[in-house]
Amino acid sequence: MFRSLLVAAAQRPQAPGPGPPRPPPPAGPAAEALEAQFSCPICLEVFHRAVGIAGCGHTFCGECLQPCLQVPSPLCPLCRMPFDPKKVEKASSVEKQLSSYKAPCRGCSKKVTLAKMRSHVSSCAKVQEQMANCPKFVPVVPTSQPIPSNIPNRSTFVCPYCGARNLDQQELVKHCMENHRNDPNKVVCPVCSAMPWGDPSYKSANFLQHLLHRHKFSYDTFVDYNIDEEAALQAALALSLSEN
């Protein structure tokens, strides 16, 4: 939602001030380059508490990079290069640049530095009013399941070894078999931990075997999440077999 703000910030005229005149802000392709420079590759929003990976030099929001720092062998989410979590540092130069540009709030039109835009938008009455008027989610057919805004994401998962994101269940199995077949580390199964019965602290002794035996099918396709794990597994197996 901040992409238009970045372009607006890049194209606004510079106010005169003390010292030598500043060069005109970039426009066109240069503005697009500025937008890319200030956007986190993970959340695609303006950087928030930006941090940089020393090895490859890529920058992310501190919070966005956190899942990668929790795995035994972290990889850069952008280039997949291994990195040392101890060598992730605050991107001070990026924060300084964010503080030098202002853009109008999309709700109240007040000019705010890009560094403070997220916090401003979260408390802006005009923005909240706009959000309140947005259409609300309504299921196409009646369902006993909670609406999506109230349930965890069970469609995509994060690799517990390297932090690769947005993997569906089959992609997670394929990714782990191709990239982590010989990794001896005990890790938490992201599929199981997303389930109501899952234990987010339990680490599988042999995660790859667990994946192959437990997660050949998608729980989302077959499972009623209101029943316990064993009943859900049996129901899913029965329905899966009936489709084959």
UniProtKB/Swiss-Prot annotation:
Which residue ranges does the record annotate as region Disordered?
10-30
| GO function terms (MF aspect) | ubiquitin protein ligase activity; zinc ion binding
Q: Where are the zinc fingers (C2HC RNF-type)?
A: 105-124
| Domain UIM: start-end pairs | 228-244
The UniProt catalytic activity note for this protein reads: S-ubiquitinyl-[E2 ubiquitin-conjugating enzyme]-L-cysteine + [acceptor protein]-L-lysine = [E2 ubiquitin-conjugating enzyme]-L-cysteine + N(6)-ubiquitinyl-[acceptor protein]-L-lysine
The pathway entry for this protein reads as: Protein modification; protein ubiquitination
Q: Which Gene Ontology terms describe the biological processes this protein takes part in?
A: protein polyubiquitination; ubiquitin-dependent protein catabolic process
Q: Where does Zn(2+) bind?
A: 105, 108, 120, 124
- Give the main localization category: cytoplasm
| CDD domains per UniProt | RING-HC_RNF166 (cd16549)
Q: Where is the composition biased (Pro residues)?
A: 15-28
Compartments it resides in: Cytoplasm
InterPro entries found in the cross-reference section? Di19_Zn-bd, RNF_E3_ubiq-protein_ligase, UIM_dom, ZF_C2HC_RNF, Znf_RING, Znf_RING/FYVE/PHD, Znf_RING_CS
In terms of PANTHER family, this protein maps to: E3 UBIQUITIN-PROTEIN LIGASE RNF166, ZINC FINGER, RING/FYVE/PHD-TYPE
What name has this protein been given in UniProt?
E3 ubiquitin-protein ligase RNF166
Species the sequence originates in? Gallus gallus
